[in-house]
């Protein structure tokens, strides 16, 4: 077994040696941090949970009091980070802290700090004692080095059993008291404030008598309020932001498009259709100047009728000596230009004639000016920049005003004097269409610019306000942002499909080439019928033995690390599996003269398999649990594990490690099938599909866990009875199998559960449609949760949920890998697997999790294991799930394309970064342990204590936890893996295919998607807090998860906004182009993906069906799910006979831990052998059971 070194454990001599080579500041920091894990410290406590965090807190306080530098949370090396319970690897560190450590391959002594050792210079006698303690009495370097317990610790262990019950009761009372005085959290306070209008007595009247129900309802309203606020913000950003910052733009009329009902004065248009002019020379009383006079003024510019004089132009424009323009005592002029109108297009020539009298039509009187200023303008006249470049006019811009420099020609040189710069501007053709604001910034030039704006302004330039510009910027940034996400997801999905996915899959299987059209057609035909068996397997691919030609040049030196596996320069990388690291004599060998076909033996070719008793030499390796030297005293050579009592006579022999039928080393795989209430036909086809996979049956075994004694609706037999009929050649007759206890994932008395273990080989049935020559002999183990005797008369005895079934296997694998105390059930599981496979359980590296209603394509298992072996960083993966009942109803039709897009776009995109956020529980694979460093070093992944502990959480007291653990446990397992191992990968393997049946009734679909959507929201809330995922800032998986979370909660609002935009674009003008283009890209790119990846045009039709059903997917289902946030039932997904609506979280009574026996495997096995020798009839443990302790002492 791979046993990592204890972190944080350093010998005193190593500390003293390193101290002379390092600065004092660094030495002081390290001594402080290392003292946290020093077992000789007076603060050392047997409960590791409180030891680390509390002791480090005391150290920080002491250093602060002494005036030292307080330890900061930032810029701390990972190995010095604080190991508090919130750390992702906290439990793993606690488990490995006091584990036995093997002699490293470097030749140096392990750094083990013995308890009670004085920090003094060693003597030869002490060195010899230390060596004996480390390497054993006989100096066997292959034996593990265990800590020798002190007398004080031995006394504590002896007395711990007597006070365990009393301590447990006291701890329970203390926790209950703490819960009563626990201050409310910020979230609880917010939910209480937001639901102040619904006091508890009102909620009791509406069917919420329990406090937990009312609390869940308040949390639901709190979440809905946040969703509404996010939706309101998105709506404001979409529709209200522009109206707020830009405001309602004033009415503006474009030059040369102003009708005859208007006149223009100083760049503004006035509607004079209903106006009348008083009597004047040449103008009758009550006359409309637009139509009633001989000269029609409609559409003309009358700025010279009401000239702005004596303003900024005073001093610049003056009266000549012989001028007829009247002035006052201040020298103010009455007018500058002749009082005539001109065409708005600037085509009028200067007119200096005078009608009736001097100053006629100049409106210099106060009453005339007052009447003009009282008029309300209809809008500004605006010019575009293209209009200012018109060659027929000489237009320029100053401070947003359009100046017609041709109007300077209307000056009468005999009447007024004006600056020569006016003439220079008039005669300069280079300033046409130029903004002159910069040139008229200071001094006299600035006054000239203002003067020109008052006398020759003909309009304004077409510009937006700052608010409008800001709204446009926000619009385009949002557009670019959304388009970037959509296009990048599309491009990366294609990148994964074309270039990355083929690297993971096996190059060739029994079904032919991976990318062959024939295989794709076989998959489509196979997936159209749920009960259709897989295609007939072709002849096995010829085995491949890797070339081991030695290199002439050396590949290592004295400086090479012994932990590094050399690849020999540019040679093919050496993939590592458990079998490839162990000698072939340690496994069940094939008979002499056998061919690779023996590793796929069928039931026709049963015969005696020779078993070598010497294959499990304890001193040969340190990889396997049962081969460890610790068991040499328990299992003597005369009764080796290979005896008839341990290994089934029909066990499938193990091939040599270098046999590679598919181009990669074979890894041992468990195929976990969880059953609840499925019928015989469904379970039969599922197990047939797994047993018939082309992966060698020497490296796969089927583990079926039945979740209680359940009878499906309309079934004749219960599910366990159906499954037991599918096993042959059991090691123990089914009627003689006993039930054993284990700790279930439940509360109250249900935490104690019992199960039976059956081990044998898969039976294809008497009337199987599978040809006999194709029936492989596959090891099989069945675990039936039958419940305690107290629940024998209950409706569903033993039922604890799917998560409990998964934890049975996960906890078993953890205890096997860490050699922890196990329950009686786990001991029977260990022996059962060993009986039917001939290999110890810790040889298994991966586990395939399949639902009982899911059928696997024959070469899917091969492709999945290929990805695991080729990339040790992959810790989880999933394949594509196809729908078998596509055309059963309109409900199934709308799901076809949704399944396709979720795999080939969403999961393919996430696979590029190795962060698939959801590995579906119906068809996924997890890595049990991964190779780390050099030879025979492995680290737990799925068997990691942090994964098992958090996934087996039984205190589910908040809405968030209930949605994670009761509704979406499969997705939460993926979340836990990413949260604990953010640097490892979870990917999608499109070559691995399965099929399943989806809901064909809308109410069932509604119930299923309610669970999935709520689970998605809460799992994304967990993942968005993981900071160590791939990438940084906007280019990171964390940001992608945040966008996905926001996109999920605003789905109802988004589809509502989309429908509004489409309808408004049809019935209103102008058409909103940008939102429509964006909508077309979002909905159209998946269609391109279909054509590129699916190679079947029929999926385009499925896409159209999906688009029609978008209101259901994006509005009906999410809205229903959000309103049902506090509903934790499974609804109508699967019914059983006589089922009552009661969840797995309901628990009554008290948990009695004394009913569960927990011991290490070697202790169980020693007692068993003692009973066999003495003929005793005692319990399995051989003596009264040991109380269950959740935190064992090492």
From Swiss-Prot:
Region Disordered: start-end pairs: 1-91, 136-177
Please report the organism this UniProt entry assigns to the protein.
Emericella nidulans (strain FGSC A4 / ATCC 38163 / CBS 112.46 / NRRL 194 / M139)
Q: Where in the cell is it found?
A: Cell membrane
The alphabetized UniProt keywords are: Cell membrane, Cell wall biogenesis/degradation, Glycoprotein, Glycosyltransferase, Membrane, Transferase, Transmembrane, Transmembrane helix
Q: Name the enzyme group at the top EC level.
A: transferase
Keyword Chaperone on this protein?
no
Organism classification: Eukaryota, Fungi, Dikarya, Ascomycota, Pezizomycotina
The encoding gene: chsD
Q: How does it sit in the membrane?
A: Multi-pass membrane protein
Q: Which domain of life is it from?
A: Eukaryota
Catalysed reaction per UniProt?
A: [(1->4)-N-acetyl-beta-D-glucosaminyl](n) + UDP-N-acetyl-alpha-D-glucosamine = [(1->4)-N-acetyl-beta-D-glucosaminyl](n+1) + UDP + H(+)
Indicate the transmembrane segments per the record. 221-241, 476-496, 1039-1059, 1073-1093, 1097-1117
What residues are glycosylation sites in this protein? 351, 390, 582, 608, 885, 1014
Q: Know the name of this protein?
A: Chitin synthase C
Task: Tell me the InterPro entries matching this sequence.
Answer: Chitin_synth, CHS4-like_dom, Nucleotide-diphossugar_trans
